[in-house]
C-alpha cells in the first residue's frame, strides 16, 4: 500500500510545483524583492544601492550626474593622463618589430557549460570559466582571459564602439580582459594590486547575413534583458568571435574604460572587424538597466554605454610587425564601419523606373536619379536584366557610362519571355547604391517587385483592367495590371531583396522555373487585381525610427490612384488616428516596462495566435471580407526588435480603441488602401512554419450560412483567395471572429501547459524511480538488473605494431602534427574524444545515491567494468562499502598496471588506504597540490609527522625528500586489525609495508608543466622504484583523469620505446579511455605527451651514477659513424631549444632594450623575474634576470647581469620584492669602471629606493685555500612605511673559476655559498657582467654537487639544458659544457678518496699512471 501511495504523493507534489514554477517563470514580478529568488528583480532596490555605496564602491553611469564627466570625483584615476579609449590615427602609428603574432591557447576549444553571461547594468559581461591564454604581441608574459564585455550605441547600427580608427567608430566593441595568472588568481585582484593587465578590443561591423558564431551570444543576450539577470551560455568558440586574421593590430598603453580607470592596461586593438547582422544587433538594443539619478531610480534601455574618447597625451600607438598583415587596403574596413544607410550604400536606389516597348524586339528602360547621394559623385549606372528560356536561367548586365543618360534600350527581346529589370548606381571606389525596384515585363504586362517576397492573389477581379500602368508599391508587395484569364497561386519567399553590400546580385539565380510557373506565365495572360488595395511606403531613409511603434488607422476615404506623396501617407478619420496615436504612445511609455517584462512570456502565445490566424484565413478563403491589418512584428509587440532583418519602421499595426478588437471600415463599392507602412500578408510553407508574426485582432462580417461548412470542415488548401462575386473583396485574407479567438488562444495555451506538465511528470517519475526507490530497495543480488554492472564492454584493443611509429620517424611525425596550426593534434584528440561515444559504458555504482558523496566531482565517474572493488565492511552499510572512485588502467603489455583514482576526500581516507593495502601497492604517484588557485584539490591522506590511523591501517611518515619539482615521501604502513575488529597476530612482515609517494608539485590543474625534462625525470624515477612483487601503481591528481592519464601514457610509452623502439600514443590512449573517462583531459596535455616523448628520444637517459661517471664520459667522447661524438650531440640539444620556451618579448621592448648589457643574453618569458611595477611608468616591471632551477626549488637561483648605473635601483628592488638574502658577485675578465663596479652604498650614506633604504652595516673577508679572498658585505634593507627589515649578505668573489688553480678548488666557493644558503630564505642572486657563463656554471655545479650528495648520481645534460631554457645564451661553447663534466669527475674522484690512478695538475689535466688506459683518462676531454 505504501508503495502504491508514493507515486500519488509525487504526482500531487508535481502539480503544486508546476503551478508555482509557472507563476515564477511567467510572472517574474511575483518573485521580485526576495533574496535568492529564481528571477531577481531587474529594478534593483534602494537597499542594494545603499549597500553598494556603504561598501565604498561608488555608483557611476554613462549619463546624467553620474556620467563619465563626473567619474573623476569618485575615482581620481579617471583624470589621469594615460586614459582610454582613444582614436587611433593609422598613419601616425609606427610598426614595432617586437609586436609579432598573437598566440592564443584554448581559444579554439568549445566553451564549457559553466560559462555564463550577466547584465551588470553597465554592460553585458561573459564570465569565462575555461582556460584561455594570451601571449605574444609584446605582452610581458602569458596572460589568462577572464571576462568579455560589450559596448554599443543607440540603435540601428549607430556608433557604439569606444575606440575608433581614423575617427570611424563601429556599432559594437567587444573587449576581452586578461591578467597574469602566475601573480594573481583573478583579474579583479590584479586591478586592486595595480598590476599590469591586458585587453583586446574587437569591432563588430554590420553585414547582410547573420554571423552564426554569434548565435550563442545573441541567445544569451535575450536571457539577460533586465539588470542583474544571469544565464548560462550555450557552447561557443571564443576564437570565432575574433577577426579571421589576427596579424593586423594596434598596441598602446592605457587604462580601464570604466572606474577605477587604472592606467595598467596593455591594449590590443584589432584592425579587422567581425560581421554582425542588423537582426543580431537588435539583441543589444533590447538590454535594460536601472539608472540612479539623485534619489530616483528608473528602468531605461542600456544604450550608448561607451566612454568618450580621451587625449593621447604624447603616448605612442604602434602597429604589429606581422608580415603582410597590413598589405590590404584599409578603405574596405574604415570607409563605412557603422553599417547605417549612409555606409551600406553610396546612395538611395534609382527611382521612377519604367519599362516601355519600342517595337516588337526592343524595350526602353528609364529611371530617375537617386533622391539622396551619400558618397558623391555617381560615376555610372548598371542595368541588369534576366530571363528564363527552356528552363535555363540567363542574365545580362551592361553599364551606362554617363551619369546623366538615364535611359537604356534593350534590343533582341522576345514578346513571349518574362524579363526582370533593375538598375543600380555606381559611385567611386566601386561603391554602389541599393537596387531599384525590380520590373517584371512580358509583352503588355508589367509588374513591379521590391523587397523579399513576391505576393500574388489567386482570383480574377470583377472588372479586369485594360491598361499597362505601373505604380510603385511597398516592400514585400506587388501590383499586377493586365487582362486575361484567372489563375491561382501562393506567395513564394525569394532572396530578391535590395542589396546593401554594394555588390551586384544575381537575379537569374532567383527567378527559377518554379517561380515563373507560379507567376502564371505559361502562355496565358494574367488577370488583374485592383491596384488600389496595395499600399505604398515611404523611403526607408525618410521613415523616422521613433514612428515605428505608433499606430495608424485606416479610413473610409479612398486613396489616390497614382503614385505620389499624397498616397504615401495614411489618412485619419475625424482625428481619431492622432488621438489614438497619442494615447498609445503614452501607454507605451507608461507600460513599456511591463511589456518588456512580459515579452518572453508572450512570445509563444504570439506564435500560436499567428498560426491559428493563418489557418483560419485559409479555411475561410471564399468568405467576403474587409481590409485587414498587416502582419504585426512591431516595436510594441517585439520590444523594438525586427524579425528576419526587416526594418522596424515598415510594419506598424493599425490600432483603434481596445487592443483586443480592431476594426476597419470601408465603403461597399470602393476598395481601400492599407496604411503606408503596412505590408500585405504573404504566407508560404516556410513562412507559415517559421516567420508568421502575430496579427492584430479585427472584426469582420459574419459568415454566410452557406459558407459555414468551411469553418467546420477546413480544407488543407493553403491558397488565399477572394470571392469574386463579393463587391467588398478589398483584402487578401480574412480574420477569424473574436469568438473564435476567445477559445483558440486558451486552448493552445492549456494544451502547451498540459504537455509541459506531462513531460515534467514523466521526468520526475523516472528520477524518483531511479534514485529514491533504488535508495530504499537496493539489494546486492545477482537478480537485480539495477546493480549488475555491464562488464562486457567493447574495449578498444591495443593496436598492433603496424600502427606504432618507429622512434626514428617520430620526429617527422611530430612535425607533421604541429604543421597547419597544430591541426594534426586537434584531429587526433577529437578522435580520442569520440572513441567511447558509441560505447554503452556504464557507471552505475558511481551514480548510486549511497556512493555519490564519495565522488569529488559529479562528472568524474568510475566505469563499472574496470572499477576497483574494495572488500565490503561488515555492518548495515556493507553492501555499498566496496565502492571507491578508482579504475584499473592497462600499461604497456600489462593489464591492471595502474589504478587511476581521484584525490582522496577526508571521508574516503579509510577507503583509499584499504585499496592501497588490498592491491599490494608500493608506489603512489600524486600529481596535484592540496590547494591550487585557492581551491581544495586534494585532502592530505598521509601524516605530517608521527603517525596517523586510517581505519585498521597505521601510517607513519618516515622522511620527506624535497626536490625542485617533486617530493618523495616514504610511508610505513602497518595493519593492526582485521575487518571484524579483532587483533590480528603478526606473521613476520606481512602486516607491515613501505609505500613510497612521489608527489609532483609543479603541474597546474587542467594544464601542463612549463618544461618536459623534470617530468621525464619524475616519471623515470617513480617507475624505476617499482619492483616485480608490487601491485598496481596508484596514480591520482585531483579528478584522476587529466594529469593522471598524461602520466600513465608517458610512462607506458617510455617502456614501449625501451622495449620495441616504437611509439603509439593515439592507439594506447584510445585503449585506456575505455577504462576510465577523460584520461588526458585536454588537447594541451595530449601535445605535452608528444613533447616529452620527443625530449626522451632525442636526449635519451643522461642520468649517471657516480661509480659509472668515468666510463660514461669516455663513451660519449667516442666518435660515431658520422664523426661526431655523443658529447657534441648533447651540446647541440643544449643550445637548440624549442622556440616557445625561449620567447623574450619583454627584453625586446623599446623601453627595456637599454637595460640589457648584451641583447643576446636576456631572460625568457617563462623564467623572467618580475618587479612590482611603479605607477604611471612603463616597463618598470622588467629587469634582466632569470630564475634558475636548483636542486631543492624551481626558483632556487636567480642569474642576472652586473647592474648598470641606471638599473642599480631596479637591482635592489628585485632583492626587496623577492626577499633574496644572498648575492654572489662574480667578476668577469673585463674590469668595470669603479663607479659602475660598486653598486652598493658606502657606510656613510644609505641608498634611498623610495619604498625602502639600503644600508651597509659591516664588511669582512674570508680567505680561501689558495690565498684568495672573498669580501663579505652585510646590508640591511629597511622599509620606509613600516618596520619590515631584510638582511642581505653580499659575497664579492675573486676570479672564478680560476684557470690557474686545481679544479677541486672550484667547489670551495660553492661550498661556502651552499652553507650560507642553508640558514637563509629566498633565492640566491648570482651575477657576472652579462649574467652568462660564469653565473651559469656556478649554478650548474651547485645543483650537480647537491645531486651527487643526495642521490650519488648526476645529470649534467639536464642541468645545463634547463639553464639554457630558462636563460638562453648562457652556455654557447662546447668547452663550457665540457668543463661541467671535468668538474664533476674531479668531485667524484675526490669523494672516492683516491680511488683510481688519477691525479690532477694545475690545469685540470689528468696525469695517468703507467697501468691506466689513456682512453679512460680525463685527458680525452681536452
Curated annotation (Swiss-Prot):
**Signal peptide (from-to):** 1-19
* Organism placement in taxonomy: Eukaryota, Metazoa, Chordata, Craniata, Vertebrata
Q: Which CDD domains match?
A: alpha_CARP_receptor_like, FN3, R-PTP-G-2, R-PTPc-G-1
Q: How is this protein named in the record?
A: Receptor-type tyrosine-protein phosphatase gamma
Source organism of this protein record? Gallus gallus
Ranges of the Extracellular topological domain: 20-742
List the residue(s) that the UniProt entry marks as the site Ancestral active site. 1328
| Acidic residues compositional bias, start-end | 577-602
Stretch list, region Disordered: 541-708, 1396-1422
Compositionally skewed regions (Low complexity) per UniProt: 612-623
Binding-site residues for substrate, renumbered to this chain: 1005, 1037-1043, 1081
Topology Cytoplasmic: residue spans: 769-1422
Q: What is its main location?
A: membrane
